Amino acid sequence: IMTDDQLLYIKAHLDEYNEMLRDKGPEHIIRFILSSSKRPILTSNFGPYSASLIHAVSKQRNGIPLIWCDTGFNTQQTLNFAKRIEQSLPIDLKRYKPSKKYSESELPSESGEAFQNFVNDVKLEPFKRALAEHNPDVWFTNIRRGQTAYRDTLDILSLTSDGILKVSPFYFWTDTELRGYLSQF
């Protein structure tokens, strides 16, 4: 494992490291970053391609905490998928539920202050709790270019406002490439 100074160096030279990692595969990126991380976490919403990142990270190191902010509004299919992943891969699933509960009838429309409060209550509050509990130095995520305008401004490596190194090993991959990866296991 690299020293804290080496991780600080990577954070201070993100552009150089992003350029260096651009033509590397996810396994290489994950292995390289794990060599400098003492407290990595992995996040998932158990969406269509989430197994790719969970599989790739767990191949490199067992037992990394997998943070799942369970909003309480998941489909049975998502719950079954999460259970299947937990049973088949060497992960340490950490499920965080919102402190505040909402019923279906309380769901706000997708705009305005009520919606922002809802998002804060069911997504951000549990995630902030997870970050406080795990105090990660590295956060593996499956965000990709082309998903949102904001995500298009990021890269393989980026920094959160809290200084956590955010790593997106599949950042430049297409849906087709991810389907191909998933078909291998």
Question: What are these model-derived regions, one by one?
Answer:
Residues M2-F185:
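Nucleotide-activated chemistry modules centered on ATP-dependent adenylation/adenylyltransferase
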